[in-house]
A protein has these predicted regions:
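Polar, surface-exposed loop/tail segments
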Residues: 480-517, 575, 592-627
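Short, structured active-site-proximal loop/turn typified by the sulfatase FGly-forming signature C/S-X-P-X-R
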Residues: 42-95, 151-155
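Acidic, Ser/Thr-rich low-complexity intrinsically disordered segments
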Residues: 612-663
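Beta-strand elements within well-structured catalytic alpha/beta cores of enzymes
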Residues: 28-41, 54-56, 80, 145, ...
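A long, amphipathic alpha-helix that forms part
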Residues: 241-274, 279-330, 357, 361, ...
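His/Asp/Glu-rich, glycine-adjacent segments
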Residues: 85, 91-289, 447-459, 465, ...
Length: 663
């Protein structure tokens, strides 16, 4: 018998091993996640956003997508980062109550806050210091990928970008914010308050002739110029007329001239997230529609924001086109953190009906650089004012320390010739007889304002106070839905007029204090069924006619999502419910990464959108209705469910006994 050479036997064995384990020969793919902050699905078209439109048409079009609620940036950033719902991550809103006087380690109390705005690197580092080095409690996908040998980077808008590698962010002994070698580039890069970049990144930026300091949003103009994208105007002065051009271009250049070339040269698989501030920032601040509902966020300035985000995506896609070997191995996933609506500060319905609450009837002394607003305007902090009046509670401003008296915070004057309102650009309030403790824990209610929704905390955990507050909320004409902590209302019928927080995924394993009550404000459409025409009551310093989000309304839960690349189907429309919570599980599946978990509020792998994946049959849309309060007032929640994951469409407060669905 002819003897088989040993070298040939080894060749056969290696071939058989490769067949038995395809993973041994498969090259790991790359993933680019592009987040267009505040992009509405209906804003994407071939003319204004050709790059976004191309991905939708050539790859997978997710036409039943969802943001998590509240529809806010850092909340959805936490879901995108971890694949967990907010009940697990604790990032309930952009502004929340941390339960402690939050300050930089070893800094005296006056430097802290109990109303932190999370789009801030220092605040995020403070939260990590207060909550075991990672306030999210869940591991971000990018951090896990980096540990497993992937190159990773997060680039873009301040706040949500750092959240993508949150467990790497901390204060060092010198009082600087470090990232343990992680690449995080945002608005604060290069500043003393920013996250330090690895030395190799700064060297590469110098070599690429790029500034080491991130540009501001001014576009090179003065603080009050309408060409400054950060200028929001006031009640009598229109806001910006331009997109965030200069800063966004710098982010795109850092990505395509430094980060992607670095990754390509190192020949390692990578995960890159780019978070475009536009169109969000431009829609917020646009000056096209001062004190008018039309054109609102559908005007020319908002369109410039759309075009700016699309320009950034095109620059990334052009780089891939110029590097075909990388492109062939790279998936691109597009999302937005939430939708958007035009702010209404007076009208509560499409027929022009205005709010009749006390807060809208008072005259106010403008704060800071504000100017007097039109009669009948709901001021910022209107919910705190109305609860204070109806509940016979004093209102205190947690952003201003008292200079006299026994209270730790300045009281907000309500009534008299001119009233005041709480907060400035950060809207928060403490309600009660007095508040002597700096952490606010002796207040009856703590309110954190977040645009289309507000969070209410009850430090005493008094169930009678919670029920009393729910009763007050049901009587306010601008309320669009009420949700109460399961500790007080575990079932849909336990708190008349309200549903439990677990119904919207806000009860989980979070380390942070959970709100006792979450309210969403009224939302209406000027054209029935047209999400682009949506108007939103908003607890905000911004004006009627500008833009905001945060509510549980379909114009804000319906974000924009699409994907293309070797792991995704081509030319496929996915009508199954899905959303931001599914991004991390899907990418982890594609890359072969095992994600650790603490909580169980997890998204699903989007198998139906992957190459070779079977189609899924979605369940019928579902409705949950609370027990009625007096006059039949009840909260209605409309949602979808698939593979045990809930996707929230809208909520409303119904008063007609015959109505069963939100208008």
């Amino acid at each position: 018998m002819k003897r088989i050479p040993p070298s040939f036997r080894w060749t056969v064995l290696l071939a058989l091993a490769a067949i038995a384990c395809p993973c041994a020969r498969a090259q790991k793919h790359n993933v680019i996640i592009f987040v267009a902050d505040g992009l509405r699905r209906g804003s994407v078209n071939a003319t204004d956003t050709p790059a976004l439109y191309m991905v939708r048409k050539t790859g997978v079009d997710f036409d039943n997508s969802h943001a998590v609620y509240p529809t806010l940036t850092t909340a959805n950033a936490s879901a995108i980062a971890t694949g967990h719902g907010l009940g697990d991550t604790g990032d309930y809103a952009n502004t929340l109550y941390p339960g402690v006087w939050l300050s930089k380690p070893d800094i005296l109390a006056p430097a802290g806050t109990i109303a932190p705005f999370l789009e801030n690197d220092e605040i995020l580092a403070d939260l990590n210091s207060a909550f075991n080095g990672n306030y999210l409690g869940e591991r971000p996908l990018l951090s896990v990928a980096r540990e497993q040998g992937f190159n990773v980077a997060a680039i873009g808008k301040l706040g949500p970008t750092a959240i993508q590698q949150m467990d790497a962010v901390s204060w060092n002994d010198l009082g600087n914010i470090t990232s343990s070698g992680a690449i995080i580039v945002d608005d604060s890069t290069g500043q003393s308050v920013g996250i330090r970049l690895p030395q190799e990144m700064t060297d590469a930026m110098v070599k690429a002739d790029l500034p080491l300091d991130a540009p501001s949003r001014t576009n090179g103009f003065g603080d009050t110029s309408q060409w400054n994208n950060g200028f929001h105007g006031d009640a009598q002065t229109p806001g910006t007329l331009d997109a965030n051009r200069v800063q966004e271009q710098w982010f795109a250049d850092v990505t395509t001239k430094v980060v992607l070339p670095k990754f390509a040269a190192e020949s390692k698989p990578f995960v890159l997230l780019f978070w475009s501030r536009d169109p969000d920032g431009t829609q917020h601040n646009q000056g096209d529609s001062l004190q008018n509902l039309e054109p609102g966020i559908n005007g020319d300035t908002s369109k410039r924001g759309l075009q700016n985000a699309d320009h950034c995506l095109k620059q990334l896609l052009d780089w891939l086109d110029a590097h075909p070997a990388v492109k062939a191995n790279t998936d691109v996933l597009i999302t937005s953190d939430h939708g958007f609506a035009t702010i209404s500060r007076r009208e509560i319905a499409g027929d022009g009906t205005q709010s009749t609450e006390v807060s809208a009837a008072l005259d106010y002394a403008p704060a800071g650089t504000d100017k007097p607003e039109p009669k009948g305007t709901l001021p910022q902090g209107f919910l705190a004012i109305d609860l204070g009046v109806r509940g016979h509670m004093r209102v205190f401003d947690p952003t201003v320390r008292a200079t006299a008296g026994s209270s730790a915070y300045q009281e907000v004057q309500i009534g008299g010739e001119l009233s005041h309102y709480p907060g400035n650009e950060t809207i928060a309030a403490l309600l009660g007889d007095t508040v002597k403790k700096v952490d606010g824990s002796d207040a009856q209610l703590i309110l954190e304002g977040n645009g289309g929704s507000d969070l209410l905390y009850v430090p005493s955990k008094n169930p009678e106070l919670v029920r009393k507050t729910v009763a007050l909320l049901t009587q306010l004409d601008y309320i669009g839905g009420i949700f109460v902590d399961d500790a007080y209302c575990p079932a849909a019928t336990d708190c008349p007029g309200a549903l439990p927080l677990s119904a919207i995924g806000l009860v989980g394993k979070s380390q942070l204090p959970r709100p006792a009550i979450v309210v969403t404000f009224r939302n209406f459409k000027m054209t029935p069924g047209d999400l682009q025409s949506a108007k939103q009551i908003s607890d905000s310093h911004l004006q009627e006619g500008q833009g905001n989000h945060g509510a549980l309304a379909r114009d804000q839960t319906f974000n924009n999502m699409a994907a293309m690349g070797p792991d995704f189907k081509a030319g496929f429309v996915d009508d199954a419910p899905m959303g931001n919570i599914d991004i991390a599980p899907t990418i982890a599946h594609i890359l072969g990464i095992e994600m650790p978990s603490v909580g169980t509020l997890k998204g699903r792998v989007l198998t139906e959108a992957l190459a070779g994946g079977a189609l899924l049959k979605p369940d019928a849309e579902k409705t949950m209705v609370s027990a009625p309060f007096k006059d039949g007032i009840r909260t209605v929640l409309e949602y979808q469910e698939l593979d045990g994951v809930r996707y929230y469409d809208r909520a409303c407060l119904l008063t007609k006994a015959t109505a069963t669905h939100c208008p």
